[in-house]
């Protein structure tokens, strides 16, 4: 009862004032249609007024060019997805490329030379404009890891720099709004250290989607929550910790979007009588009826599970879990989403990212609380309300482990990080039907700077773009970017980019840092 009263007070505090400028970025998975029965979701089933930005996941890549994953995307799903903007003219749509199943090899090949990056950029502009997308989202998991060479960390930054310049130039020539540029990034400090130059990402991207979930799961030997808001004294993994880590490393807080999972992670308990947080587990619980993935339940499957289960609340992490027999699930609900929305507002972050819309109760048929109950709560609290200056009693923002003023400056320094970080796939993507030293163009300066003195001019001599507001049919070659005569910038070129002192892409000279007591999984998830 105390938790419920505190939650009601929190919602009232959040809704005390009207008007707020936050982003609510929501992914839609292009394999959602393949789920059975009422769980099958198409782009036309989405509510165009819930999110400020919708992101279509995922596109693919062929010969260093972005392409639709299959003909169905170009002929049916892209048009349906972008037609949502006809109902809400303020909505922005992005196309995401990558994902866990995509791997890293095609990214590495594309990033390896300026010529390949130029091909990718030209194809991206053509595909985005042809189908009416407003931007590109890069879901590269991860530069310099999972088989990606270390130089990809720097080549990825070169790509972002070149994309941004090309997007600006294309906007000038076509008199259209500039295409947006975003990226999905890890929540793991060890991955962050190896994969990203945080300050440069913050300068080059319009917003940064932090994957602050899958922090615990059935790959571990004890139960833990998928996406706790706050850390425990013996477990620093949490959404708050991750967001403050990115901010302390130099990312602009207004560009950081915290990840909100519309799914739970499950465990099979060793003993049914031992069912608390941290109880011994022996693997994943049974697959869900619709998602059919061991260790994973969509929110609409969680609703069915908890009807016959015992529910508990983790006081210091502000998230629920439930257990039934030997099955245990850590998940989010509207109450935990409310606390997380409160955290975003109090800490002045840019907003929320949802993975994914199609894992929420889209039609309201499973949970009995109306369509999109989780995302609707975020919409209501982030987009329609402004937080007051008074904290609700007992809300743990001031604890040492969660304070934005102590993390991560107090982290221990490690001299070496193992290559096997136990990196894990993001929620639900395993059900996707995917089929799929030193760089030769760089010079290391005496001061440690990394520059590319011979980077050629980025040219778009044959780029063709569809008329504004028009979605073209895919034509015969649906797996390749489509160009249609309309605007042909024959002299569309971007001059070489001088890398200024203080802004150049520079390898770090400091030792890597890692959080104290951070325990990483020993290996990848078995499912």
From Swiss-Prot:
This is Oviduct-specific glycoprotein. Belongs to the glycosyl hydrolase 18 family. It is found in: Cytoplasmic vesicle, Secretory vesicle. Pfam families: Glyco_hydro_18. It comes from Sus scrofa. Binds to oocyte zona pellucida in vivo. May play a role in the fertilization process and/or early embryonic development. Oviduct. SMART domains: Glyco_18. InterPro entries: Chitinase_II/V-like_cat, Chitinase_insertion_sf, Glyco_hydro18_cat, Glycoside_hydrolase_SF, Glycosyl_Hydrlase_18. PANTHER family: CHITINASE, OVIDUCT-SPECIFIC GLYCOPROTEIN. The keyword Glycoprotein applies. Residues 22-385 form the GH18 domain. GO terms for cellular component: extracellular region; transport vesicle. The lineage of its organism: Eukaryota, Metazoa, Chordata, Craniata, Vertebrata. Disulfide bonds join 26-51. Glycans are attached at residues 62, 402, 441. One of its GO terms (molecular function) is chitin binding. One of its GO terms (biological process) is carbohydrate metabolic process. Keywords: Cytoplasmic vesicle, Disulfide bond, Fertilization, Glycoprotein, Signal. Residues 433-527 are annotated as: Disordered. Residues 1-21 form the signal peptide. Chitin binds at residues 71-72, 98-101, 142, 211-214, 355. The gene is OVGP1. The keyword Acetylation does not apply.
């Amino acid at each position: 009862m105390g938790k419920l009263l505190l939650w009601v007070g929190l919602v009232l505090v959040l809704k005390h004032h009207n008007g707020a400028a936050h982003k609510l970025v929501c992914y839609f998975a292009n394999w959602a249609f393949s789920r059975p029965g009422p769980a099958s979701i198409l782009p036309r089933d989405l509510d165009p007024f819930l999110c400020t930005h919708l992101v279509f996941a995922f596109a693919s890549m062929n010969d260093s060019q972005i392409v639709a994953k299959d003909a169905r995307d170009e002929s049916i799903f892209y048009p349906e997805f972008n037609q949502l903007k006809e109902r809400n003219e303020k909505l922005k749509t992005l196309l995401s490329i990558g994902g866990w199943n995509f791997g890293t090899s095609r990214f590495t090949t594309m990033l390896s030379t300026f010529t390949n990056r130029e091909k990718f950029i030209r194809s991206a502009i053509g595909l985005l404009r042809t189908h009416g997308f407003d931007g590109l989202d890069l879901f590269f998991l991860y530069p310099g890891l999972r088989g990606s060479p270390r130089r990809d960390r720097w080549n990825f930054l070169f790509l972002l720099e070149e994309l941004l310049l090309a997007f600006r130039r294309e906007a000038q020539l076509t008199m259209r709004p500039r295409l947006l540029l975003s990226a999905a990034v890890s929540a793991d400090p060890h991955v962050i250290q190896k994969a990203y130059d945080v300050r440069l990402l913050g300068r080059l991207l319009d917003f940064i989607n932090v994957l602050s979930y899958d922090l615990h799961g059935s790959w571990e030997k004890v139960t833990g929550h998928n996406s706790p808001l706050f850390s425990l004294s013996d477990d620093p993994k949490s959404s708050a910790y991750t967001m403050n880590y990115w901010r302390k490393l130099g990312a602009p807080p207004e560009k950081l979007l915290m990840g909100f999972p519309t799914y739970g992670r499950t465990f099979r308990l060793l003993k049914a009588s031992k069912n608390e947080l941290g109880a011994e587990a022996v693997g994943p619980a049974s697959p869900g009826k619709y998602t059919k993935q061991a260790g994973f339940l969509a929110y609409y499957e969680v609703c069915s599970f908890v009807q016959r289960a015992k529910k508990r609340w983790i006081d210091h992490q502000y998230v629920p879990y439930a257990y039934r027999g030997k099955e245990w699930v850590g998940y989010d609900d509207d109450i935990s989403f409310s606390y997380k929305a409160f955290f975003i507002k109090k800490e002045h972050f840019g907003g929320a990212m949802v993975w994914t819309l199609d894992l929420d109760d889209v039609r309201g048929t499973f949970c009995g609380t109306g369509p999109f109950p989780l995302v609707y709560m975020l919409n209501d609290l982030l987009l329609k309300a402004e937080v007051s200056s008074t904290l609700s009693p007992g809300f743990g923002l001031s604890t040492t482990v969660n304070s934005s003023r102590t993390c991560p400056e107090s982290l221990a320094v490690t001299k070496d990080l193992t290559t096997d970080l136990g990196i894990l796939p993001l929620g639900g993507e395993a059900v996707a039907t995917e089929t799929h030293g030193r760089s030769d163009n760089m010079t290391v300066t005496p001061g440690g700077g990394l520059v590319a003195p011979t980077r050629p001019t980025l040219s778009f001599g044959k780029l063709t773009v569809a008329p504004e507001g028009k979605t073209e049919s895919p034509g015969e070659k649906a797996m390749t970017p489509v160009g249609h005569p309309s605007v042909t910038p024959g002299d569309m070129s971007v001059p070489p980019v001088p890398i200024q002192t203080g802004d150049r892409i520079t390898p770090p000279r400091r030792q890597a840092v890692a959080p104290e007591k951070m325990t990483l999984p020993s290996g990848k998830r078995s499912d």
